[in-house]
Design a protein with these regions (language model features):
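Cys-dependent protein tyrosine phosphatase-like superfamily
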Residues: 1-137, 151-157
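Ser/Thr-glycine-rich phosphate-binding loops at phosphate-binding pockets of nucleotides
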Residues: 148
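Short cysteine clusters
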Residues: 141
């Protein structure tokens, strides 16, 4: 019984998450995409909590950057952004792509799953990409903890 309720709530949340936030081309679309970014992607928490840390000279890890974070990265001289989340037609990706282009930041996507162990070949590819990207570089996932932490540790090996 409880598992059915949990599954129903998960489906309800997923349906809400996927019902809006996919358009930033109009004033109204940008408004709703920002609502989506703040509430569904939990960006409002990242206003107060920024998981930005240097892991090696010229290599940083962070949580999902907001447009203001990307502006700060540009001021720090960061040249590249490596997203471990992958491409999605969702608010967080639309805003990140738009602002990286606007700021002249090199945005690369090398996704790894947040819900299962990554394949070794995917990790090797990410480390190769990370080593080849113009530095300074910041890598991120949603929270800057699990995926970003794993890739950071592997990079240091």
């Amino acid at each position: 019984m409880i598992s059915k309720i949990i599954k129903a709530l998960d489906n309800f949340e997923r349906n809400i998450r996927n019902s809006f936030g996919k358009d930033i081309s109009t004033k109204s679309g940008r408004f709703w995409a920002n609502v989506h970014f703040q509430l569904m992607d939990h960006a409002f928490i990242r206003i107060f909590w920024n998981n930005f840390h240097e892991i090696s000279e010229g290599v940083y890890r962070a949580n999902q950057p907001s447009p203001s974070h990307l502006k700060s990265y540009k001021k720090l001289g960061i040249k590249s952004v490596l997203s471990l989340r992958g491409r999605a037609n969702q608010s967080y990706d639309l805003f990140e792509d738009e602002y990286c282009k606007r700021l002249g930041l090199n945005l690369i996507y090398t996704p790894i799953s947040s819900g299962s162990a990554p394949m070794p070949e995917d990790l090797l590819k990410i480390i190769k990409v990370l080593r080849e990207l113009p530095k300074p570089v910041v890598l991120h996932c949603k929270s800057g903890a699990d995926r970003a932490g794993l890739v950071s540790a592997l990079y240091l090996l």
